[in-house]
Amino acid sequence: RWYEVTGVQTCALPISMPLPCDIKFERDVPVKLRDGITIYTDVFRPIDDHSHPAILAMSPYGKEIGSQWLDDVPMRAGVPKKATSGLQKFEGPDPAYWVSHGYAIINPDVRGAYNSEGIILFFGSDYGRDGRDIVEWTAQQDWCNGKVGMSGNSWLAISQWFVAAEHPEHLTAIAPWEGLYDCYREVATRGGVMMPEFIKFLTESFASTESGGVEDCMATMLENPTMNVYWRDKIANLESIITPAYVVASYTNPIHTNGSIEGYRRISSKEKWLRIHNTSEWDDYYNSAHVEDLRKFFDHYLMGIDNDWKETAKVRLSVLNPGNKDIIDREEEDFPLQRTHYKRLFLNAADGSLNDEISKNDSNHGYDSDSSKRSVTYRTRMKEDTELTGYMKLHLWVQAPEHDDMDIEVKIEKLNCLGKKFLVSPMKAVSAKGYMRVSLRELDLERSTEQQPYQTMAHIQKLKDREIVPIDISIWPMGILFKKNEYLLLTISAYKSPPAESIP
């Protein structure tokens, strides 16, 4: 078995953080999965004869620099080069930090990635069982104390939902940092609107070889546009998860916001915590204060240290405030907030307003989806300082003359007291969005609530000529502050595909 000792104060990459300790680096360690497939993992661990807890970071990007890297992200998403050592896999924990605190880091090339046998899976129960195999292999190593955690953001966070749902005996704690859980409703489609661009961009970045390959999720999406056995297997069974969990979310992520928060709400773990931050997923994950916070969680569960982690508030909440100072880490008991007051606003097409009372006059609003003006807007001026935190929905009656379907996008934004948008970083677009393909409007009455409509996505109901139908559009969670006389802007538009590379 090949290994090397990476020495203290050396740098793995130019300008990177010097290593704080000596590290034993074992490369391409073979791991046999339950079906005979062999995958390969890198192991970083302390140089001693003691047993240590391990942290697993599971993804198909490559166990070293791989096919994606922070340098590929504009301005490294605010993560300075000196904040990391360069030993970490993309979106994974930095071995330099964790080994110096007594942990081993397990960075596998999952099934099909690089030299690992098989084809890369786009999540699902088999992917989760692969993770279970890796967890149990790790726990059996003589350098491991039998306790394994999981960490990482985005794909590495989604992996944790699927692996934890398979109940590996030695999986002791998870820390999913911004990860969706439903591959159909949150990445292949939104509200039934197909979004193949990101899946294509993502799968092309996987570290597959000619001898391997990637599950063709995009082709399956085009062949199977409605919910079926295939897509149900791509939904993590959150309710079956009982592992202690530290979940991190944000309002500004275009694919992970809903899944991260729903993951926290729906897992059955009795010991679980949620933190909603106000930056980007990478900036937050590698922020030194948050790394220390995560270590306190892992120290408690993986090392058995009797620290004060359990005194941490169950929910720590950020509330965004464009044009002013955000609220950060406000302590709460739950999400959505128990003191939430839900309010209805009625659309008035005559003047484009949102009002407390329904208009006495009938009106309608329309747009041409093929023209440059493919949207309509409504606004309301805040009569007092207001916090909008939690879930929203939009109820509409719609028709599509001479067409049998519609793809709708809705967006909630804050405007200043002059009715102008705030200037914010492209990495921090402050808006809450929802989508709907009208032919997939059928509600799941068992899952839907007054605040959160939930579609079955199982039956296509095409529109008849000039038929008017009601639809309920779920708008993903948001936390935002309005000062008196600032505006809430609602935009309803025909959906237009974004550039794939703009979706993290």
Where are these regions (language model features)?
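Generic recognition of flexible, low-complexity loop/linker segments
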Residues: 17-18, 28-29, 93-94, 233-237, ...
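Acidic/polar loop patches that form or flank catalytic/metal-binding clefts of enzymes
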Residues: 145, 173, 274, 303-318, ...
